[in-house]
Amino acid sequence: MTFCALSSAKGMDINMNELIKKFRESCDYNIVLIGFMGAGKSTVARTLGEWFDMDIVEMDELISERQGMSIPEIFEKHGEEYFRNLETNLLIELQKASRTIISCGGGAAMRSQNVSEMKKNGYVVLLTAAPKTILERVKENDDRPLLKNHKNVEYIAQLMEKRREKYETAADLIVQTDKKNVQEICKEMITKLMEMDSRDV
């Protein structure tokens, strides 16, 4: 199961175009996307970036580029703790950013320091989906070291449950992505973000 390929503003109704206009005018903060692998963070980040002309930082991609190796290779050579430290340092660096969509790796929100850094200049949005949906989205992807030899619903469900409390504690907003296309997910997210931002003023 994949997200609907349609991810541009073309063909949207007037209400959606008005929503996009209002959000462009009001958004002066970062949007930090967290959640389990396959929840839709990268797809949503690309769509939001396109709609609102916001910068996008894919943390895993940037870390991989800077280290000159893939995420599985970083885990293999240096271990998970080394990788988690790279995540923390990058989040600290991103404090200088504004109007940026930050797509975090699946484990980034497991560290309380990371969550603190995320919240300093933005809203944290948790994207979530059922274990079966996650498996369908990641089963052809071998760039997931924590799922190596464990691509099954039972293992994914166990790992998601272990992370659930910290994910939910970190999140300012939770968006379910099952059975929704990317436009529906993004519309729900920005509508709720605008409501939250208006209350925080």
Language model features with spans:
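P-loop (Walker A) phosphate-binding loop of NTP-binding proteins
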Residues: 36
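Walker A/P-loop
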Residues: 42
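NTP-dependent small-molecule kinase module
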Residues: 13-26, 47, 51, 161-201
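ATP-dependent small-molecule kinase phosphotransfer cores
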Residues: 58-108, 112-119, 143-145, 157
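Hydrophobic anchor at the beta1->P-loop junction of P-loop NTPases
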Residues: 33
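ATP-binding Walker
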Residues: 39
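A glycine- and Lys/Arg-enriched "phosphate-lid" helix/loop adjacent to the NTP-binding pocket
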Residues: 120-164
